[in-house]
Structure formats: C-alpha cells, structure tokens
Amino acid sequence: MESKGQHRKNSRGKHNVNQSQFQKAAGLSAELAARWFQPVSVAMKEFGITNPVDKAMFIAQAGHESAGFTLLVESFNYRIAGLVNFIRAGRLTADQANALGRRPEERVLPIERQRAIANLVYSKRMGNNAPGDGWLYRGRGLIQITGLNNYRDCGNGLKVDLVKQPELLAEDVYAARSAAWFFATKGCMKYSGDLMQVTKIINGGTNGLEDRRDRFGKAKTVLV
C-alpha cells in the first residue's frame, strides 16, 4: 500500500489515482465512484490530463457540470421564473416563457415544452440551423457539449460521428471522453489551477463558481 509520503512525492508529477482517491476527490458515493472511476481515468490519460492539479480541476468541473456525475443530458425542466435569463439574452420573449415554462401545479415540464424551449434558445447558434437542432444537440456529457458545431468537432476528436449519433454522449465512456477532449483542446491546462479562467472556458461565464471552488478545493486536498 502506498504511504502518504510516497503519494506526496508522486503528486509532484504524473501519478495514478486509485478508486478510493477518486471517490474522495469527487465527493461521490461508492456506487458512483465504481461507475465512473474507469471511464474518467481512461479519458484523462487519453487526452493528457496527467498533472495532479489538472486532474483535480477536471474532476471538479466535471462534477459541477454533471451535478455530481449524475446528469449527462441537459435538462430544460424550467419554471417560468427560471427562464428569465433567456429573456434578458433575447432568446425568448416573455410570452414564450409564460407559455412554455413549468407551472406551480406541474412537477415536471412535459417533454414537448422542454423541446420547444431548447429549439428556441439554441436556434441559429453554435451551428444549429434546422428547426430541431437545439433539442437534438442540447448539452450532453460530463462537460456539456452543446450545439451542432461542437458535436462535430468533438466527434472528430473522438473518432465517432456525433452529428448522426448525438445520444452517444449520454453513455458513460463517451461522456467522460468528450469532457476530457473539451478540457484538453479548449486550453484549460494552459491555466492550470486558475479556477476563474477555466470556469470561463467551460461555462462561458462564472455560473456556479462557489460550487466549483468547493469541489476543486476538495479534489486538491486528495490529489495534490
């Protein structure tokens, strides 16, 4: 068994993470850790995420984006009030939000209305052109790949046709590989340890920064 001192020595450069360390770093149950350890480990290795700080950042960001490694497909189960940011951004009108958003008496927004929201807010963006592209290429994977252009680019990186088979990104192996591809190719490792900059690359802003910071701190405590 590796001693604490040995782990610290190895953590200065490349080092392997075992399942117990991954579970603690990601803050997962034993069941989720068993499910995700192999896909995440293989994906990080494939795309050169080997530095302990980068591993901690990747696990933290993937954990936030996927609600703790549980959500692989973007949800549009929005309350009416939850659509306000889309209104401000000019992607929905107030009338559309009132017509499509979840009402107090509804537990879950019907899929037809979720689809309508996605097709409106992602229309003519990120390569989406056809009427149903917003829903078809909604966010999938541990780090939500979104939009036809990103699906195409990611598919090229993974050597699989994600334009024709977008649902593959909801499978664990591709969910992890797509996240590692994004993290590596979008320049996240150029800002090793810079939570703010990496969050902007992944999110386009700083949404959920406190949760990302908490996750990163926990992961660093275990891995670095």
Regions from the PLM with identified roles:
Residues 37-48, 58-63, 200-203:
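Amphipathic alpha-helical segments that form the core helices of the histone-fold
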Residues 174-176, 185-189:
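Proteins synthesized as precursors that undergo proteolytic processing into mature forms
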Residues 45-50, 164-167:
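Short, mixed-charge amphipathic alpha-helical segments
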Residues 1-17:
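N-terminal secretory targeting signals
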